[in-house]
Design a protein with these regions (language model features):
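Flexible, non-catalytic linker and terminal segments flanking ANL/adenylate-forming cores
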Residues: 1-27
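Structured binding elements
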Residues: 102
Length: 107
């Protein structure tokens, strides 16, 4: 028999009533959620960096290319990959590519 546990959350008494007490999180993986955004909004801006905008579709192509390269060098599901890069679009693509192949990103 399943039992529901009520967790005390005293901070909820002082929150704005417009703010929900709980959130409905996606059941998709991180990459699955990005892929969903690509399908829904392919031509929307995913990010802007140094004056250049990149759409979700363009970003997804970069993530896939990076994931393909990771697989080519032998990165597999469950492997740990340390990402030591500056805050730049390439870091974002690498992070999602590592997750796409099922590896664990360590930053």
């Amino acid at each position: 028999m399943s039992e529901t546990v009520q967790i005390k959350a005293p901070w909820l008494a002082s929150k704005d009533p417009e703010v929900p007490s709980t959130l409905n999180y996606s059941t998709l993986s991180m990459c699955g959620r990005v892929e969903e955004m690509v399908r829904q909004y392919p031509n929307y801006t995913a990010y802007e960096f140094m004056g250049k905008t990149t759409t979700y579709a363009e970003m997804w192509q970069k993530i896939n290319a990076c994931a393909k390269s990771l697989k080519a060098i032998g990165i597999r599901e469950g492997d740990k990959v340390t990402i030591c890069m500056p805050n730049a679009p390439q870091t974002l693509c690498m992070f999602y590519a590592v997750n796409m192949v099922g590896a664990i990103a360590n930053m």
